[in-house]
Amino acid sequence: MSRISKAEMSKLLSVYFIMGSNNCTKDPLQVLREALEGGITIFQFREKGEGALTGEERICFAKELQAICKEYGVPFIVNDDVELALELDADGVHVGQDDEGITSVREKMGDKIVGVSTHTIEEARWAIENGADYLGVGPIFPTSTKKDTKAVQGTKGLAHFREQGITIPIVGIGGISIENTASVIEAGADGVSVISAISLAESAYESTKKLVEEVSRSL
């Protein structure tokens, strides 16, 4: 197996859904199914924060979500937990700046997908040099889902990455909705990652379809 190509990674980032059990008011398995039917291109399991599952329950829940992703042929990424990603034989892992270092993550993950959250050009260059397949850049807009976020960058912050010669695939993160998706793509992102825009939508299916349309219209 070899590392994923830039072109393939770029396509996968189009509509990137992130979810844990505590991000939904409905059955999360049903929400994921609807999102997959609607056209998400990649999924990240992020079980964090108040009311999050732990231990065996967390592992069982991850396996259920992974099985659904497999049915649809959509990559299943684990947030921040390299050991869990390896245990599940997940398609990849996404790490932040305060998590395990990228060099050790790449070593453990082999050729699987590795994404890194970055907030500065320096962080981006370090991640690229040490084996990141894509960058998560943000928060682009204010968000209430993550309590530990850095300062809002706006689409200008994202455009700055491209202006500074960062050519690796980028997914915009933070406060992204159907209404502002186009501006994120126009600023240079390959895709958008969302939590509540899908997980709390009245219809996860309809919301996903609209996000897919917005992204393909803006690319």
From Swiss-Prot:
Cofactor section: Mg(2+)
Residues annotated for Mg(2+) binding in this entry: 80, 99
Keyword Magnesium: yes
EC number of the protein: 2.5.1.3
InterPro entries linked: Aldolase_TIM, ThiamineP_synth_sf, ThiamineP_synth_TenI, TMP_synthase
Pathway the protein contributes to: Cofactor biosynthesis; thiamine diphosphate biosynthesis; thiamine phosphate from 4-amino-2-methyl-5-diphosphomethylpyrimidine and 4-methyl-5-(2-phosphoethyl)-thiazole: step 1/1
Entry keyword set: Magnesium, Metal-binding, Thiamine biosynthesis, Transferase
GO terms for biological process, alphabetical: thiamine biosynthetic process; thiamine diphosphate biosynthetic process
Keyword Mitochondrion: no
Cofactor note: Binds 1 Mg(2+) ion per subunit.
UniProt record similarity statement: Belongs to the thiamine-phosphate synthase family.
Protein name: Thiamine-phosphate synthase
Source species: Bacillus cereus (strain AH820)
Gene: thiE
